[in-house]
Amino acid sequence: MTARYLGMNRSDGLTVTDLEHISQSIGDILRTPVGSRVMRRDYGSLLASMIDQPQTPALELQIKVACYMAVLKWEPRVTLSSVTTARSFDGRMTVTLTGQHNDTGQPLSLTIPVS
């Protein structure tokens, strides 16, 4: 299969293709607080404002919705079918996104550390 997209890995400068770039892009979207980019104030997610809140079922739902809405708005290459969260005892949180790559129909499953 030929890559439809070539980009650059932010950490080592090497070439990345389709799914690698989508993963990098979604990580950036979720970790960027809304309002923090000067020329694009609405870019990012509301996730940063929720990270240190008390653990409740309502907060977990808000986190999932914040992730889903940010990816829906800023990453048109994927369609999500589920968003799940997991927190470890040391306070780290990961978000697992499952869905489909829109161009190829290929299933997509990404686990992204967000804290």
From Swiss-Prot:
Native organism taxonomy: Viruses, Duplodnaviria, Heunggongvirae, Uroviricota, Caudoviricetes
Localisation: Virion
Alphabetical UniProt keywords: Late protein, Viral baseplate protein, Viral release from host cell, Viral tail assembly, Viral tail protein, Virion
Designated name of the protein: Baseplate protein W
SUPFAM superfamilies: gpW/gp25-like
Function: Baseplate protein that is part of the outer wedges of the baseplate. Probably plays a role as a connector between the central and peripheral parts of the baseplate. Plays a role in tail assembly.
Main location: virion
Transmembrane segments: none
UniProt GO cellular component terms: virus tail, baseplate
Organism of derivation: Escherichia phage P2 (Bacteriophage P2)
Similarity field: Belongs to the GpW/Gp25 family.
Induction: Expressed in the late phase of the viral replicative cycle.
GO biological process: viral tail assembly
